[in-house]
Amino acid sequence: MDVPKIKDASWRDYQAKLQRERRYKDRKKFMRRKVKFVLPVLVVCLAIYGFISGSFGSLFDDGKKAQDPKPGKQQVASKKAAPAVSYDKHEIHHFIDSRHFANLRDNFFEIQSNGRRLRVQTSIDPSLQNYLSQKLDRKNSSHIGIVVMDPDDGRILSLVGFDKANPSNNPCLDSSFPAASIFKIVTAAAALEKGNLRLDSKLRYNGRKYTLYKSQLKEKRNKYTHTISLKDAFAKSVNPVFGKLGTLYLGKTQLESYASAFGFNRQINLEVFLAPSQTVITDEPYQWAEIACGFNRQTTMSPVHGALISATIFNRGKLIEPTIVERISDEKGVNLYQSQPAVVTQAYAPHTSAAMRELMKTTIRSGTVRGTFRKYRR
């Protein structure tokens, strides 16, 4: 399928656009904060913080019953009427599926449901979506899935996929792909919180970085032993180090607990059905090592879930519920669905997020993806 070219499109242009929009949003937020503090008696401000319990009189008078200044006239509420809502995320699955989002070019589409024509407004950024679609290597790939997400609220800005065998399929929503080293994020959070480790904690391993043999899980020191910090082991994706974290520091219980906290083996709500990511942890210590470093094909996940896991770094450990449909309205413009930000779990403690962010930064600066990001450095 040919994708229309974007005139003078470039990654740097798009980044500059995002920065301008971010500065504009920051200015708006600043002005809202000023209004909030200068005019704290406004009903809107009081409603935001939950201080209204019925009337201003109950907050400011001397205990006497508040009097209506103009008896017989209804007071006008300052809060806007809530939009009419008929559907929740699960109900939307009945008339929207992954095919509607197969390389969507616009940020909306229309469908027929129960004799009604519905307009579905998505969170997709068309310019970013089209840019990424142009960059797909369809010739040399069997599957590609690219998900771009706003970590603040879980809005999916781009959902670009390619399946050579089934063009109508969207791999971004397919939960059958091996999680591989993405699971090291889960293991790292568990090690920092339950393994009593720090970023500069020294860890040892023998053999190669990207293998995982049972002999590499033994605690031994000789002239071939390598010493590495937790931070560098993460950045360079050292399998035997993370295998040891699984067997010697965490074990089955902690691995299961943190896997669940990061969204594995649970249903994550999205407006289109998203099968749960899977991991099965047995009683075998070597299997704990395989799970902890992602050296297996049994731990599976979708690209959308991968983006959610990365977003915890920016949300102080919160796993945010994703959303791709902002609203659904009927022919008359009446809202039938409105997305709302929601938290799935607290994957790790807020104070751990700074260390997790440093792990990700080190991976970009000196780790396995250094070459990929080199040309984008300022």
Indicate residue ranges for each PLM-predicted region.
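Beta-lactam-recognizing serine transpeptidase/beta-lactamase-like catalytic domain environment
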Residues: V3-K7, R99-A102, I146-N169, G195-R378
